[in-house]
A protein has these predicted regions:
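Beta-rich, blade/repeat-based domains predominating
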Residues: 9-24, 53-68, 94-111, 136-153, ...
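Short loop/turn segments immediately following beta-strands, especially the blade-tip
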Residues: 167-175
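Surface-exposed loop/turn elements that mediate protein-protein interactions on large endomembrane-trafficking
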Residues: 39-40, 77-86
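Conserved beta-strand positions in repeat-built beta-propeller and related beta-rich domains
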Residues: 22, 27-32, 68-73, 111-117, ...
Length: 189
């Protein structure tokens, strides 16, 4: 059995999206409802908290440094050194109760994130040229986005529907197609 240790009492209201920053060898995560981003150096146990003016659902690493993030105000860049946020675009600006929830960066650097808070939510992709594509609709709470090791499939969970979907994924173009329900746990305890 694994020995699990409590590293830090961050007291999050809604802690999500742990992200290992291999560049700094540090762990980042968000407290969505607390409007905070946490940074922890597991070797020195130096802990930093950044107070953010918006709810951040997820962070992703940028090749040029800093982070891309999905927030209640859409997609943005964030520089922890200055705590500066530069907003890019908000594909859900017409939905004031909507925010972004979970997401991930694919192998070629596109940032994927799902919206949450409306009756029908979506899965979006932010491309390198900063254009945004809506790739899936009719979702409740898109969560847990990831890819198969060979990058042939994209997976994500729709938490409220208790389903994990699998799409065929084209790495070169970032297109998804042929959704199947890979796991349906709606009737399971």
């Amino acid at each position: 059995m694994a020995d699990i240790q409590h590293l830090f009492p961050s007291q999050d209201q809604l802690g999500e999206g742990p992200l290992w920053d291999y560049r700094q060898q540090q762990l980042f995560w968000v407290d969505i409802d607390g409007k905070r981003i946490h940074q922890l150096d597991p070797v020195t146990c130096i802990y930093t908290v950044f107070h953010i003016p918006v709810k951040v659902g997820v962070l992703g690493l940028r090749r040029c440094g800093g982070f891309v993030m999905a927030t209640q105000n859409g997609f943005a860049f964030w520089q922890p050194e200055t705590n500066e946020i530069s907003y890019i675009t908000d594909p859900e600006a017409d939905k004031p109760l909507s925010r972004f929830n979970d997401g991930a960066v694919d192998r070629v650097g596109r940032f994927w994130a799902g919206s949450y808070g409306a009756k029908s939510n979506h899965l979006y992709r932010l491309d390198a040229d900063l254009s945004v594509q809506r790739l899936a609709s009719g979702l409740k709470i898109p969560n847990g986005i990831g890819w198969s090791p060979d990058n042939r499939y994209l997976y994500f969970t729709d938490s409220m529907k208790h389903k994990i979907y699998r799409y065929e994924f084209e790495l070169e173009t970032g297109q998804i197609r042929k959704r199947i329900t890979w796991v349906d746990s709606e009737k399971q305890p």
